[in-house]
A protein has these predicted regions:
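Conserved, mostly hydrophobic/aromatic
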Residues: 5, 49, 108, 133, ...
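Structural detector of well-ordered beta-strand residues that form the stable sheet scaffold
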Residues: 3, 34, 58, 86-88, ...
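Active-site beta-loop-alpha junctions enriched in small/polar residues
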Residues: 7-9, 38-42, 62-64, 90-92, ...
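Conserved anion-binding
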Residues: 28, 44-45, 54-145
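Catalytic cores of alpha/beta
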Residues: 43-51, 93-105, 150-168
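Glycine-rich phosphate-binding active-site loops on the catalytic face of alpha/beta enzymes
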Residues: 57-65, 109-120, 163-183, 192
Length: 199
């Protein structure tokens, strides 16, 4: 499972990989490709990345002006194209307004830093969103994964797991340390899927 960040230099100030790079990654290592679109126009780019190997595409609600109808339509289109779909919320975006579309989500990604750059400090108050998502999943009998991205390290991952995260995205911490040791030395950590973010 590989978490693949896509940044357009507009929605977030950084600029990263395009669909051709994803296609190359998929050919070289046929892992499950979790593509996180940090772009101004996810309606345009989601189909392009699916065509080039994305197994799951998540996009920011803010990029669609937090419009529930547009978000629902894009999730439907992603599913129509044969991929899994998910939504992402920035730290300042409430999750509660999107309760009605949770049934269409395969994944909900909570950003625990401002998106765009690695190495930022974990925002612990974002775990309140995780707790809410876990409770709603149980109440509504849904099956979406709860993912968190930003500031995950040897201390914060335990907080994320305790709050209810299924999937942790780690970038800077993984690549600045011994990957094998980090991923497999802690039983609580290795029991969960950690996705290595290509920075």
């Amino acid at each position: 499972w590989l978490h693949f960040d896509v940044m357009d230099g507009h929605f977030v100030p950084n600029l990263t990989f395009g669909p051709d790079i994803l296609k190359g990654f998929k050919k070289a290592c046929p892992l499950f490709m979790d593509v996180h679109l940090m772009v101004t126009d996810p309606e345009k780019y989601a189909p392009i990345f699916i065509k080039n190997g994305a197994d799951l595409v998540s996009f920011h609600t803010e990029a669609l002006d937090n419009d529930v109808n547009r978000i629902q339509n894009l999730l439907d289109e992603i599913h129509r194209l044969g991929a899994k779909g998910g939504i992402v919320v920035k730290p300042n975006t409430a999750i509660e307004p999107f309760e009605s579309i949770l049934k269409s989500c395969d994944l909900v990604l909570v950003m625990s830093v401002e998106p765009g750059f690695g190495g930022q400090k974990f925002m612990a108050d974002m775990l309140e969103k995780v707790v809410w998502l876990k409770q709603k999943r149980e109440d509504l009998n849904l099956s979406y994964r709860i993912e968190i991205d930003g500031g995950i390290n040897q201390d914060t991952y335990k907080l994320a797991l305790e709050a209810g995260c299924d999937t942790l995205v780690a970038g800077s911490y993984v690549f600045k340390n011994d990957i094998a040791k980090i991923m497999f030395s802690d039983k609580d950590y290795s029991d969960k899927r950690i996705m290595v973010k290509k920075l």
